[in-house]
């Protein structure tokens, strides 16, 4: 069989270049056939070449889409998606009075091959309610999970485990990466920040001039953060923030 070698092929618009039977076409030193893909700088810019064992094609670098769950629901695998990176964070614990703040939810992350999976149920843990005084113990946040693959428990509320203490952070499990959420602050004479999670810490704290600062701004905090405490006993702390499940989708 003979070879035709060229570094450039030109054809008029709408025309076809025919290679005679018995000849191979070599473009830039590479023989082209039904399993070869000539590079197109304009169409394939920013992509990489991937093979499924039968044929090769150009694909995008990085995730092609992201599914975010701020409430529980079902993730359905989009057509052509083969792998995902899943991130889960548990709900934050609520703040109590006297600066005893809630802890952040734990965090887990995992790479999952989803070629044999059609759907997975995602559970998003709620943020817990806040309290006042020593006896108004902030509740613990809820657990977030991606099916049975990975999960992250919620942070505990201020004054929940021991009196005068901040909450204990939640913990991720089942992932390639599993970490604790940040703990809450203990008793003091001003507001204590809510525990910091993977996405950041609780809302602002303040002194006596703005006693309701934490409560009034409790939604201005990232997912999974612990609730900032109230100033002194009678002022209610901030609720813990709900968790989240984030699915980054790759071809």
Predicted regions mapped to residue ranges:
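Acidic, glycine-rich loop-and-strand cores that form catalytic or ligand-binding grooves
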Residues: 150-218
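Outer-membrane beta-barrel transmembrane strand signature
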Residues: 215-229
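Hydrophobic residues at beta-strand termini and immediately following loops
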Residues: 69, 152, 223
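Extracellular repetitive beta-rich solenoid segments
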Residues: 2-62
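Glycine-rich strand-loop-strand elements at beta-sheet edges
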Residues: 68-70, 74-78, 85-148, 165, ...
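Short hydrophobic/aromatic-rich beta-strand motifs
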Residues: 36-38, 45-50, 85-89, 220-224, ...
């Amino acid at each position: 069989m003979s070879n035709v070698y060229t570094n450039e092929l030109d054809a008029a618009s709408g025309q076809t270049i025919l290679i005679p039977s018995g000849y191979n076409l070599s473009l830039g030193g590479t023989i082209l056939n039904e399993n070869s893909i000539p590079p197109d700088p304009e169409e394939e810019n920013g992509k990489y070449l991937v093979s499924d064992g039968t044929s090769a094609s150009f694909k995008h670098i990085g995730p092609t889409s992201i599914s975010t769950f701020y409430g529980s629901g079902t993730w359905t695998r989009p057509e052509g998606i083969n792998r995902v990176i899943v991130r889960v964070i548990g709900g934050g614990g609520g703040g109590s009075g006297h600066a005893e703040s809630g802890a952040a939810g734990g965090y887990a992350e995992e790479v999952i091959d989803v070629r044999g999976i059609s759907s997975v149920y995602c559970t998003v843990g709620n943020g817990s309610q806040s309290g006042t005084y020593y006896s108004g113990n902030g509740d613990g946040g809820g657990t977030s999970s991606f099916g049975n693959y990975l999960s992250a428990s919620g942070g505990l509320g201020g004054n929940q485990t021991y009196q005068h203490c901040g909450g204990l952070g939640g913990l991720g499990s089942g992932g390639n990466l599993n970490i604790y959420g940040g703990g809450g602050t203990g008793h003091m004479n001003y507001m204590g920040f809510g525990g910091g999670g993977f996405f950041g810490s609780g809302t602002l704290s303040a002194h006596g001039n703005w006693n309701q600062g934490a409560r009034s701004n409790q939604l201005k905090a990232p997912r999974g953060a612990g609730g900032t405490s109230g100033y002194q006993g009678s002022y209610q702390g901030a609720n813990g923030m709900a968790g989240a499940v984030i699915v980054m989708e790759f071809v």
